[in-house]
Amino acid sequence: MDKKTIYFICSGNSCRSQMAEGWGKEILGEDWNVYSAGIETHGVNPKAIEAMKEVDIDISNHTSDLIDSDILEQSDLVVTLCSDADDNCPILPPNVKKEHWGFDDPAGKEWPEFQRVRDEIGKRIQEFKETLV
């Protein structure tokens, strides 16, 4: 079976998409190539790194990346995680499916907000995996 590719996109590739990439690699495993990117790059938020560390997922080596058209066009599924990314997502080829999974932006908020959003993203990716079986 060929590996499928999922591409998580948010506005700055700083918090939500970084956590989604970490969860995606953990939950979807070897069957999927998992990437994340942003409409802009804001650097990986240290609180996102810390939040994922709490659930034993290391995203400290992640980089904040702009959308890569090659990855985008080869993706099986593009998932936008905020309305800005959903509204500004580049036009996709017909073979690429797009879904919007909206999550609150924890940036600039208190620590419990990072934990809540982290857990919501993990739960949504787990639910997605269960639909694949």
From Swiss-Prot:
Membrane-spanning ranges: none
Known EC number: 1.20.4.4
A GO molecular-function annotation: arsenate reductase (thioredoxin) activity
Swiss-Prot/TrEMBL catalytic activity: arsenate + [thioredoxin]-dithiol + H(+) = arsenite + [thioredoxin]-disulfide + H2O
Disulfide pattern: 10-82, 82-89
Keyword Cytoplasm: yes
Stored Pfam families: LMWPc
UniProt key word Cytoplasm: yes
GO biological process: response to arsenic-containing substance
Source organism superkingdom: Bacteria
Any one cellular-component term (Gene Ontology): cytoplasm
Alphabetized UniProt keyword annotations: Arsenical resistance, Cytoplasm, Disulfide bond, Oxidoreductase, Redox-active center
Annotated compartments: Cytoplasm
Active site residues according to the UniProt entry: 10 (nucleophile), 82 (nucleophile), 89 (nucleophile)
Function recorded in the entry: Catalyzes the reduction of arsenate [As(V)] to arsenite [As(III)].
Annotated family: Belongs to the low molecular weight phosphotyrosine protein phosphatase family. Thioredoxin-coupled ArsC subfamily.
NCBIfam families on file: arsC_pI258_fam, PRK13530.1
UniProt name for this protein: Arsenate reductase 1
Organism encoding this protein: Staphylococcus haemolyticus (strain JCSC1435)
Gene: arsC1
